[in-house]
């Protein structure tokens, strides 16, 4: 379960940011996670609660924005959102598309304080 190591990294980054800002507690952490990031959101939430114990993030809410897979289709000359991220084919022209524009993100976007 690599979500636990991801959760520990999130807690470390957020705790460091809180200390640098002189903040005692973080109430929410906002993440953007792409559909291709290989992260199970529920497992990350569970792991985050464990990793946050005894830190300024204890009890903080983990808010996850899921990012769909967007690819560039050279035949349509457009960015398109894949309806099935397992099939890298343009939903407009049904041609193969391999240039990923979005969908691999794993970003800490914002921290909220009480």
From Swiss-Prot:
For binding Ni(2+), which residues are annotated in this chain's numbering? 2
- Quote the Pfam families the UniProt record gives: HypA (PF01155)
InterPro entries from the entry? Answer: Hydgase_Ni_incorp_HypA/HybF_CS (IPR020538), HypA/HybF (IPR000688)
Q: Superkingdom of this entry's organism? A: Bacteria
Q: Which GO terms describe its biological process?
A: protein maturation; protein modification process
* Protein residues bound to Zn(2+): 73, 76, 90, 93
Which keywords, in A-to-Z order, does the entry hold?
Metal-binding, Nickel, Zinc
**Any keyword rRNA-binding?**
no
Q: Does the keyword Metal-binding apply?
A: yes
GO molecular function terms listed in the Swiss-Prot or TrEMBL record: nickel cation binding; zinc ion binding
Tell me its family: Belongs to the HypA/HybF family.
Explain the purpose of this protein: Involved in the maturation of [NiFe] hydrogenases. Required for nickel insertion into the metal center of the hydrogenase.
Q: Mind telling me what this protein is named?
A: Hydrogenase maturation factor HypA
- Originating species: Chloroflexus aurantiacus (strain ATCC 29366 / DSM 635 / J-10-fl)
């Amino acid at each position: 379960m690599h979500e636990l190591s991801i959760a520990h990294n999130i807690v470390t980054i957020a705790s460091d940011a809180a200390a640098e800002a002189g903040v005692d507690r973080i109430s929410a952490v906002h993440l953007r996670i792409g559909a291709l990031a290989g992260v199970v959101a529920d497992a990350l939430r569970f792991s985050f609660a464990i990793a946050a114990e005894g830190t300024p993030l204890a009890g903080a809410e983990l808010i996850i924005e899921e990012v769909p897979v967007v690819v560039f289709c050279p035949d349509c000359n457009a960015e398109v959102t894949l309806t099935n991220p397992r099939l890298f084919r343009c939903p407009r022209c049904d041609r193969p598309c391999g240039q990923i524009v979005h969908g691999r993100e794993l970003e800490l976007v914002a921290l909220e304080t009480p």
